[in-house]
Amino acid sequence: RNKVKQVKFPFHLRVPKWCKQAEIRVNGKMEQTVKGGKIAIVDRIWKRNDKIELYLPMEVFTSTWYENAVSIERGPLVYALKMEENWEKKEFKDSWYGSYYYQVTSSDPWNYGLADFDRNRMNEVAQVSINSQKQQLDFPWNQENAPVEIKMKARLIPTWTVYNEMAGPQPFSFCGSAEGGEQEITL
């Protein structure tokens, strides 16, 4: 058994860039705050049973992709429109990639544009709900068990259509092309 009661060393923690400002606590007391994208160093004398906690507050934000497509993100996750999933097993003739794969399709509408889109107000317009019971599940990586949902207002864009069995090019402008009133969508 090791007789050393305490030891001094630096403890390095990487704070991801998506986190605006993290908090580090040692034994329940605030040690320091660190901006995202930085390495925090807690250099101290450590004793047996010391406890270090890293808090990474998650905010809703957006990122822009090809053809000005916008994705909704919160913390390290990118959210997708919640849709009914139809899973179909497909066989490969050539086993180079495996013997089969699953094709996932949906008959639900997918071509929505965000109705109240303002990058600077995402935490106001996006309603985040966290199901604490689902947070305890062993496998949260599917729609049924996902513990976090984001609800937003959107409008259907009928001019944005399927092309080659996938989402076609986005219309240059959605002005005047939205159909019907605002709907609440779930991501």
Residue ranges of each PLM-predicted region?
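Beta-strand-rich binding/interaction modules
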Residues: 6-26
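Surface-exposed, short loops/turns at beta-strand junctions within beta-sandwich domains
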Residues: 46-48
